[in-house]
Amino acid sequence: VELCAERAFLKAIGGSCNAPAAGLAHLDENGVLQMDALFAPDQKHYRRVSGTLETGFDGDKGVCLGEELAEKLMQGKVWLVGAGPGNMDLVTQKCLRCIRQADVIIYDSLATDSLLNEARMDAELIYAGKRADHHHLRQWETNALLIEKAKEGKNVVRLKGGDPFIFGRGGEEAQELRAAGIEYEIVCGVSSCYGAPAYAGIPVTHRDHASSFHVITGHEGNHKSGTVLDYATLAKEEGTLVFLMGLKNLPSIASNLIANGKDPKTPAAVIQEGTTARQR
């Protein structure tokens, strides 16, 4: 059974001296087969996987486990990566590593396109281009593309400004990847919600003035019939209110806060292209 599983794995993976692969199976006294396997399709970066199956002494079941692990290893992986707020010095080391190793990079509108210069010469670059009221690819198309490229065995980077889980639709994409059985990893990025104010000299918390800060979308999805923001509660908050992507709706945001009791003299700032040389 062990031998059947190992041979099936190596056959399915196409293991050779050009693309190192290894599989080790162990059948315990209860008829449970445990197998560990690894594969280096690019001859440098090993992928590892393991699996367990109650096979008894049925060699065909061992074959099934070996082939299943091979399929998992030949499938690619997706990294949902935050590129930071725009200043290249604020890009994380892990973000750079992901970009440099990626087979495919699906990227949004970035504050600095020079980050893409870090990609391999043979990497496939696909623009998804999200800006207010204009998406080069619709979200479902982006989701499908991530899954498609990963199933081709590619290492895929989904590159977003800021942090992928702060109004970056990273959560939606992670859900779709999980449902499709695609391995993925979240790579946090510096968010403009605190990076941009910091570069403007504004602390979002301060012992004398703000014991909390609140990050709020300034651009609610078009699928909503109206705002779901509770301006009555927001207006009462002592902490700093940070509205992201709010330039277009700035008059509405300000008027809603004031209408719900926020002092019109409350200190406020509008920051564009924060942390970059174009900040204003």
PLM features per residue range, with description:
Residues V1-G76:
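Small-molecule-sensing regulatory modules
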Residues V1-L3, R7, G56-V63, E67, ...:
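Electropositive phosphate-/nucleotide-binding environments in soluble metabolic enzymes
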Residues A8-A12, E68, K72, K94, ...:
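Alpha-helical scaffold segments in soluble metabolic enzymes
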Residues G15, L27, Q75, R97-C98, ...:
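Solvent-exposed alpha-helices and their adjacent loops that cap or buttress functional pockets
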Residues C17-A21, G82, S109, V242-N249, ...:
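Glycine-rich anion-binding loop/nest that anchors nucleotide
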Residues A22-D28, T52-L53, I126-G129, C188, ...:
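Beta-strand->loop->alpha-helix junctions that form or flank phosphate-binding loops
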Residues K77-M88, Q93-V190, G195:
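Class I S-adenosyl-L-methionine
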Residues Q175, E183-E185, S191-R280:
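Beta-strand/loop-alpha-helix module characteristic of Rossmann-like adenine-cofactor folds
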